[in-house]
């Protein structure tokens, strides 16, 4: 299986400062059995012109209004013919020029194959094994995740969600549909984005909680909360104050600062503990 066709999908909107480095990163890959798809949401900042400059490196692209990131990702998927899809959005870059060659040389057979992600010059691994605990606490990094095209076409991203549809897809595919999974110790991508806004993150957290409540019985959900975080006097206090909007925002912003200072080392450690 050393001639896998890899569909790389980039979605963007008014990303003229980031889109070129992403396209260039894809074009510079030594592995050439790539299908590159770019979905632009009708940008007005010059992004379209940059995409046109790289037309020879892109198999399909379009610039037109869409309904947001997940409709755009689904649109890109609908044009994919590869064995696997990977979503490298504007600003994301591959870790090295031979990343895709290394992935194909690893002989991927599983439905979902995950490598590692570079954040703030630190390599953050995806987990070796996936259980519900992963999705209660976090998710897999989509920039380092290769998904069977047939799988994502069967279960497309939920376009009613604004921030958590990729989490939902991975959770349902791996936990409820028992999709096969493998972690490979290969850094796949570099993530340099600033992350979601406070409002978008809040929406994503709400969507995750609503989906967990919808698909898990209450007592099982409570067990996972206890299993993942433990019930301590401190946690009980946090649960109470997190219900106060101003306090919740302070906690969220403080956590963001701490994680940046530590260069995501805490996140890396809990992955190792799984």
Model-predicted segments: where are they?
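Cell-envelope/extracellular polymer assembly enzymes that use nucleotide-activated donors
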Residues: 4-7, 35, 168
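Membrane-proximal basic amphipathic "stem/tether" segments
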Residues: 217-274
């Amino acid at each position: 299986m050393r001639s896998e066709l890899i569909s790389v999908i980039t979605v963007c909107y008014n990303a003229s400062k980031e889109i070129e480095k992403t396209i260039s990163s894809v074009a510079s890959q030594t592995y050439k059995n790539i299908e590159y798809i770019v979905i632009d949401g009708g940008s007005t900042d010059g992004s379209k012109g940059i995409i046109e400059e790289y037309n020879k490196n892109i198999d399909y692209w379009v610039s037109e209004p869409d309904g947001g990131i997940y409709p755009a990702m689904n649109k890109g998927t609908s044009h994919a013919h590869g064995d696997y899809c990977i979503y490298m959005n504007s600003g994301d870059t591959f870790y090295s020029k031979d990343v895709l060659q290394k992935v194909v040389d690893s002989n991927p057979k599983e439905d979902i194959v995950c490598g590692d992600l570079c954040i703030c010059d630190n390599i953050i691994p995806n987990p070796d094994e996936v259980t519900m605990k992963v999705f209660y606490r976090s998710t897999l990094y989509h920039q380092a995740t290769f998904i069977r095209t047939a799988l994502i076409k069967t279960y497309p991203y939920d376009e009613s969600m604004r921030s958590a549809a990729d989490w939902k897809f991975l959770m349902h595919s791996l936990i409820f549909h028992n999709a096969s999974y493998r972690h490979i110790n290969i850094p796949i991508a570099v993530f340099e984005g600033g992350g979601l806004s406070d409002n978008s993150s809040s929406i994503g957290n709400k969507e995750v909680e609503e989906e967990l409540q919808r698909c898990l019985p209450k007592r099982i959900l409570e067990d996972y909360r206890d299993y993942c975080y433990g019930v301590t006097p401190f946690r009980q206090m946090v649960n109470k104050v997190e219900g106060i909007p101003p306090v919740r925002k302070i906690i969220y912003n403080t956590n963001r600062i701490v994680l940046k200072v530590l260069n995501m080392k805490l996140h890396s450690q809990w992955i190792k503990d799984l």
